[in-house]
A protein has these predicted regions:
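Active-site glycine/GP-rich loop and adjacent strand/helix microenvironment
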Residues: 1-11, 139-411
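Nucleotide 5′-phosphate-binding alpha/beta core
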Residues: 1-127, 131-153, 173-175, 180-182, ...
């Protein structure tokens, strides 16, 4: 049957309880997140996994939980990091910074920083975690995490100066001052704005290469980053439980990184242009996921369900807007935003009464849209969604407890 696991894959998962019924019935349905959590970890436990947990070859972690419940995962230590390093080292545009042993500084959510500090505390037998010392935020010989606050819009001068000190320390490890910057795109954009606000531009040495990952990057944010950096700016797409699946080049073209994986696309709800990603992966030997619905959506160049024709990652299933004109993805809505103004930075749609909404937005320069820009944006949203939407300028939009923004507010 189409999209069913091969004999080789079944051999690798034959002892895992969650798959016993599917193996017996010779049919694997789509694996949903609630099924993964059911009877966890017993539904995944095998003698091999139990032994790996005892020796430290496997560990329990939580997914980042961008705008949904955090999911329990079992994986090898540094599972996500190893696939990151493999992509970095082999990438044609930025592999040179790996080969030159450049230090990696990571500017992303405070949850990521706290995870590193927690791992280090366990390593040294400490009961409490602290992130003040750069040593506690050091993941390995190559990587240091920078951020210590939930909301990057609330960074103060002392926060920026401390992070610049960490970057300078990373530069000193290379004879020419090269370093690699890993980031979430929003965090880096906020960092650029804060550096300018506090007049610290002379202290910010530009990186030799940049990877942004961890969340959807709006077009205006990517353009803003491209305007501020001349080095290659690469996007990685993946998740905590799967590792990385795709990467792009400096021109924005995506390539697959489906090592020990297979991908299928199924239509999302009633849409004929948006597809849900269904991933079969044995990359993680302790928690292989077969026909797993990742919760991510894509669009293809010709509207077909061919994974080789993916042209963009368009958002999460749980953040699809069901409008009168049909389903609108985050990427579709983002097209409306950047079409109206390149100055819009963070935005959040607040649906109200039937087919009415408010769009809260901030801008890169802090000023509201010009009246003609606001009217154009309102028109674009109405034509694409059927919603009467009022743009409202804000100086600040709250970030989620995961350290990531939700573009679509819950009613």
């Amino acid at each position: 049957m189409e999209n069913q696991p091969t004999v080789d894959v079944i051999e690798q998962i034959k002892d895992i309880p969650i798959y016993q019924q599917s193996i017996a019935e010779r049919f694997f349905p789509i694996l949903e997140k609630p099924a993964i959590a059911l009877d966890f970890p017993d539904n995944w436990m095998t003698p091999r996994l139990a032994a790996a947990l005892r020796t430290g070859e496997a560990e329990f972690v939580l997914s980042t939980g961008t705008h949904h419940a955090r999911m329990h995962i079992i994986r090898p230590p540094y599972f996500l990091l190893n696939s990151y390093y493999q992509l970095w080292s082999q990438h044609p545009d930025i592999g040179f910074t790996w080969q030159q042993q450049c230090q990696r500084v990571s500017l992303t959510t405070v949850l990521a920083t706290e995870h590193v500090a927690r791992v280090n505390a366990r390593k040294y037998g400490k009961r409490t975690i602290e992130t003040a010392s750069s040593a506690t935020r050091r993941l390995d010989a190559r990587t240091t995490y920078l951020n210590q606050k939930l909301d990057p819009a609330q960074w103060e001068r002392a926060d920026i100066e401390r992070m610049l000190d960490d970057i300078e320390a990373a530069r000193h490890c290379h004879p020419h001052g090269f370093y690699h910057l890993d980031c979430s795109s929003y965090h880096l954009a906020h960092f650029i704005l804060k550096v300018a606000q506090y007049g610290l531009g002379a202290r910010f040495p530009k990186p030799a290469s940049i990877i942004h990952a961890y969340e959807y990057t709006p077009a205006n944010v990517r353009w803003f980053l491209l305007e501020n950096f001349s080095c290659p700016l690469i996007d990685l797409f993946g998740s905590t439980e799967l590792g990385y699946l795709y990467y792009n080049d400096r021109h924005g073209n995506y390539s697959p990184f489906l090592d020990k994986m297979r991908l299928e696309l199924v239509p999302f709800a009633t849409s004929n242009t948006i597809f849900s990603m269904i991933v079969s992966s044995v990359r993680n030997p302790y928690m292989p996921l077969i026909r797993y619905r990742s919760g991510d959506c894509v669009q293809t160049v010709d509207g077909s369900a061919d994974p080789e024709k993916i042209v963009r990652f368009c958002g999460r299933e749980k953040e699809m807007l069901r409008a009168s004109h049909g389903i609108v993805s985050q990427a579709d809505f983002d097209d409306l935003i950047c079409g109206a103004s390149p100055n819009i930075f963070v935005y959040q749609l607040h649906p109200e009464a039937k087919w009415q909404a408010c769009l809260h937005y901030t801008t890169f320069n802090g000023a509201p849209l010009l009246p003609r820009e606001a009217a154009d944006l309102q028109r674009r949203i109405q034509e694409a969604t059927g919603m009467d939407c009022t743009p409202l300028h804000r100086t600040h939009i709250d970030i989620g407890k995961s350290g990531k923004y939700a573009w679509l507010a819950k009613k």
